[in-house]
């Protein structure tokens, strides 16, 4: 794992929601994330370490209330952890570089993968492919 900033540094630089989601495995309320309806072309990066995670071409509207993707940029970009919390069996997804919590992956997505990477906006930074503008979730 890459060196990541200390908890103190992160608390200083992140919103409460961003810290809660990325560091405490939290979940933002559905339909509230800043990047949920973003339709611009570009790349979604980890908010903590800026590692690329998802291309906009793989984003789709799953109706679940969080940004959804059917495929990460690479196998190494995502770390998968069995999550048995809240009486459920799920697969947690974390940044493969810095271990920040991103969300969960489910086997109910579209082809070609059949997977739905359900990601908290608060864990992402979007970089616009045309003008380079960055938007923190």
UniProtKB/Swiss-Prot annotation:
Its EC number is 1.8.4.12. Pfam families: SelR (PF01641). One of its GO terms (biological process) is response to oxidative stress. InterPro entries: Met_Sox_Rdtase_MsrB (IPR028427), Met_Sox_Rdtase_MsrB_dom (IPR002579), Mss4-like_sf (IPR011057). It catalyses: L-methionyl-[protein] + [thioredoxin]-disulfide + H2O = L-methionyl-(R)-S-oxide-[protein] + [thioredoxin]-dithiol. Keywords: Metal-binding, Oxidoreductase, Zinc. Zn(2+) binds at residues 46, 49, 95, 98. GO terms for molecular function: peptide-methionine (R)-S-oxide reductase activity; zinc ion binding. The keyword Magnesium does not apply. The active site is at 118 (nucleophile). GO terms for cellular component: cytoplasm. Residues 7-129 form the MsrB domain. Binds 1 zinc ion per subunit. The zinc ion is important for the structural integrity of the protein. Its cofactor is Zn(2+). SUPFAM superfamilies: Mss4-like. It is an enzyme of class 1 (oxidoreductase). Belongs to the MsrB Met sulfoxide reductase family. This is Peptide methionine sulfoxide reductase MsrB.
């Amino acid at each position: 794992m890459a060196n990541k900033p200390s908890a103190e540094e992160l608390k200083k630089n992140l919103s409460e929601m961003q810290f809660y989601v990325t560091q405490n495995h939290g979940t933002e309320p559905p339909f509230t994330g800043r990047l949920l309806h973003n339709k611009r072309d570009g790349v979604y990066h980890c908010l903590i370490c800026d590692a690329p995670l998802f291309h906009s071409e793989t984003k789709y509207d799953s109706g679940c209330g969080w940004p959804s993707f059917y495929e990460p940029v690479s196998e190494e970009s995502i770390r998968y952890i069995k999550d048995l919390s809240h009486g459920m069996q799920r697969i947690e997804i974390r940044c493969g570089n810095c271990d920040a919590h991103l969300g969960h992956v489910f086997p109910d997505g579209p082809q070609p993968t059949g997977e739905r990477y359900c990601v908290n906006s608060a864990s992402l930074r979007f970089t616009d492919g045309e003008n380079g503008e960055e938007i923190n979730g």
